Amino acid sequence: QKSEKREKRRQNVKTDQGGKKVMGMKKKMLSATLCAVMVGSLAAPAFTVQAADDTLVYWSMWEATEPQGQVIQEAVDAYTEQTGVKVDLQFKGRTGNREALQPALDGGTQIDIFDEDIDRVNGMYGKYLLDLEDLAKDNDYEATANAGLMAACRDAGGGTLKTIPYQPNVFAFFYNKDLFEQAGITEEPKTWDEFKDVCQKLKDAGITPMTMDDAYATCVIGYHLARLVGEDKVKEIVTEGEWDDPAVLQMAQDIEELASNGYYSEMVGSNVWPAGQNTELALGTAAMYLNGSWLPNEVKEMAGPDFHWGCFAYPALTDGANGIETNNFGAQVFGINKDTKLAKEAFDLITFLTKGEYDQKLADETVGIPADTTNTEWPAMVECAKPVIEQSTNRFTWACGVESNVDMTPVIKENFIKLMAGSITADEFVSTMQDAAK
């Protein structure tokens, strides 16, 4: 009789893929029901109870040990406790995701939810994405979503919403407010002439105006060219070899002027990431650095708690194709597999992660930007980027299209670094690009 009781107890205990014991179906459904009654006191969105044997498979781009992974794990656990929907959360990391996701999707592996950056998901994995227009409408999702990011997702999806953004980011000039104050600078530059004035004031105060690392060199040339002629034309230049376009020489002359005036760090020609951001910007020897809004988090240990961050958009150029309303901004995004049998549950989990409590927690723990517009408290280190995000109505993709020709990217990077370092002239840069494109 005792052995029979033990056997019944054993059958009423199940073990999930993480090795943790969980309640049997009846107990779990009861617990989920109680949780659903209590959700009014929770900040995260509430959902109706689902069957306990529903299992979502979510491949994550994060590592389990990263702050993003830790918050996502906590949110998934809370979602499962609240709804009864089990989630097989697999942390793949960036390399694992990029190497394994495509063949897994091609092979029909059950993956209900996956994530990566907006362009990669909509581009590389686009044919596997579920149309989310109806789900978003039924859940009134966009009422508290960033309109610019949702528009970017639709644009990346060919006019249809196929992904949901989280962890927004923007690529702009980040700077040391204390150094600006020392140089008597009271306003952030909006035009190229104003930007050069800022550089000169910093130099006159004995401060290196800006630095750069090799990893982001293409972002500088991309931004400047795209300001002049727009991203589509930038792509045309690099893919069709149109390096004789007058905009290329204009860009090169603008950068040559910065270099000849001593506005770049003397280390810009030899900096290998993260040397510039860690040893020059973070330590206060250079004032500005063109980078993503993840930068303050990356250098916080070196910069310390007393570093006062500022941020402004890449300046507008005279007679340019666009201005400071157009920026390289984006996000990581969630996609749902078009073949999923749990579309509603998948969208509910994504909503749980991108609204309310866990969206705010993800921003706080990663020193990132909230996706939910009702989460108005941004981490102090990135609050400076809020005006740039809010003024952005048009979007550049990564490096503003200058990396569209993979065969040319290494040549562009190498010679643009030389241009910033002052070791080649604008004319030499143009001729080198023309020769390389032949």
Predicted regions and their residues:
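Short, well-ordered beta-strand elements
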Residues: 53-64, 85-90, 113, 162, ...
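Mature extracytoplasmic/periplasmic domains
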Residues: 129-134, 294-300, 317, 332-406
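A structural signal for short loop-to-beta-strand junctions that line the ligand-binding cleft
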Residues: 104, 112, 139-179, 208-209, ...
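Extracytoplasmic/periplasmic substrate-recognition and gating elements
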Residues: 77, 82, 86, 159, ...
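Extracytoplasmic "Venus flytrap"/periplasmic binding protein-like
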Residues: 78-145, 181-190, 279-280, 285-288, ...
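Hinge/lid segment of periplasmic solute-binding proteins
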Residues: 118-172, 196, 247, 310-312, ...
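Glycine-centered hinge/linker elements that transmit conformational signals in sensory
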Residues: 199-201, 239-269
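C-terminal capping/gating helix-and-loop segments adjacent to ligand/active sites or protein-protein/ligand interfaces
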Residues: 156, 165, 328, 365-374, ...
